Amino acid sequence: TNMSVGLTCRDRLHMIYVENRLPPEASLLRMDIGLKLPMATTSAGRAYYCAISDKGRKVITDAMEAKYGDAWPEKQEGLERSMEDYKKYGFCLSLGEWDRNINSAGVPIHLQDGTIMALTCAAPSYLISGEKLRESIAHQLAMLASDIESLGV
């Protein structure tokens, strides 16, 4: 598929790309290393948020509520929906919520030292529907994350 695949880590209320692979024809999806993504609306951020401890999640939730103010209820709804998906399926989605033209899936990767990162795949919404992402690609991404964790990194 014509999707970008990326690895992100947390920086306050953002996720930062530390590695990324783009398809050669990617014009809409320029996710360069070092790019900061908002935690609340991206699949990377949501995957991280869902995978951390309740205590850690409370700290982040309080900080996001203060940051977003009146926009917080909409962001909170997206995070709650992602938590439901994560508990059921092991992945999180962002279907046009960060960028209306981008659909993405994210899964956490738990490293042996306790660090949590997020693995993502994303594509323009005209190439990958939310349904295809949910029914096929996100499950494959979750299996890839599990394979990476089993390597003991």
Segments (PLM) and residue ranges:
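Structural motif
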Residues: S4, M15, S104, I116-A118
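Generic alpha-helical structural context detector
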Residues: R46-C50, E84, S146
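Sensor-regulatory modules in signal-transduction proteins
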Residues: I109-Q112
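Short, basic/aromatic recognition patches
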Residues: T61-G106, M143, L151
